[in-house]
C-alpha cells in the first residue's frame, strides 16, 4: 500500500514517466536483509515484489501508459545500495527504483 506522504511524489514521477511511455520502464522493489516476520509475505522477495507492484498500480492509475512497456521485479535483499549493518543503511535498502530503458535496447 502506498503511504499518503508518497502519493504526491509518485504523481510527479508519473507525470515525468508519461514522457517515456514508449520506452521500457522497469519498477524494481528492494528490501533490507532482515527477514520479514509477518504472515502477509512469505519472504523478502515477495515483499519487494509487492512494493514494485503497488508503485506500478499507483503510477499507471495516474497517467495512461502502455502496460506492456512496464515491467515489475522484486529483488528482495539481493541488490543493496548501502550496508545492512546500520539502521540508516537498511532504510536506504528498503526502496523502489524506477529505470527507463531505450526500447530498442533494453539492456541500457
Which residues fall in each region the model found?
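Periplasmic OmpA-like peptidoglycan-binding domain that tethers envelope proteins to the cell wall
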Residues: 1-20, 30-108
Amino acid at each position: 500500500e502506498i503511504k499518503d506522504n508518497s502519493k504526491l511524489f509518485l504523481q510527479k514521477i508519473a507525470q515525468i514517466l508519461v514522457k517515456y511511455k514508449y520506452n521500457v520502464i522497469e519498477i524494481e522493489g528492494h528490501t533490507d536483509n532482515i527477514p520479514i516476520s509477518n504472515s502477509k509475505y512469505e519472504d523478502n522477495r515477495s515483499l519487494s515484489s509487492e512494493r514494485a507492484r503497488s508503485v506500478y498500480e499507483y503510477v499507471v492509475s495516474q497517467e495512461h501508459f502502455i502496460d506492456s512497456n512496464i515491467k515489475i521485479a522484486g529483488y528482495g535483499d539481493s541488490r543493496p545500495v548501502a550496508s545492512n549493518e546500520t539502521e540508516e543503511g537498511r532504510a536506504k535498502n528498503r526502496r523502489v527504483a524506477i529505470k527507463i530503458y531505450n526500447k530498442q535496447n533494453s539492456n541500457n
